[in-house]
Amino acid sequence: MISLQEVNEKYRDVLAEIGNIGAGNATTAVADMLGLRIDMSVPQVQFLPVEEIGTSIGAEDEVIVGIMLGVGSDIDGSMMFLMDMESAQHIVNRLMMRPDDYMEDFDEMDLSAVKEVGKIIAGSYLSALSGLTGLTITPTVPFVAVDMAAAILSVPAIQFGMFGDNALMIKTEFSDELQINGYFILMPEEESYEKILSSLGLPL
């Protein structure tokens, strides 16, 4: 099996294509939803061990927002879209037409709005991956959680069962007046991970 380091180093262009297409689609969708012009930075894309996700996104005790889904059809596993609280609050305030400095706890309507945005962004990346691999990837109904990063990162194993050792992580930054930081994380089962690499034309 090719190592993660080899995948990340030798096939950087293939991974970047997933990130660029997904982020481009996500930017357009979010801009339409918010009614704003949104700029996008170049996404950072890598495969990494599942146990390294926590340290890659920041402090484990930081409160973040996570939108989580299962995936099925040609591949099995789970996926998440994670945002820091400031980014999530900014998006919700825009959608609800509130002042930018509104900082109350999220109510059910707010969480529903966050979930919808997360679903759109995650779906954009899934579509990019599906288009480049030729695989059919079907997401389940999403759910949203607001908690410490360590707690949210433990949810996929509890909700969706076992998954493989490796994850695809895409860090994306959008900006209008405020920078919005987000992480798309796909955690395929081991057999599905191999299927993704093979479908991208990467040797196993």
Regions found by a protein language model. Give the residues of each.
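Composition-driven recognition of glycine/serine/threonine/acidic- and proline-rich low-complexity segments
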Residues: 2-204
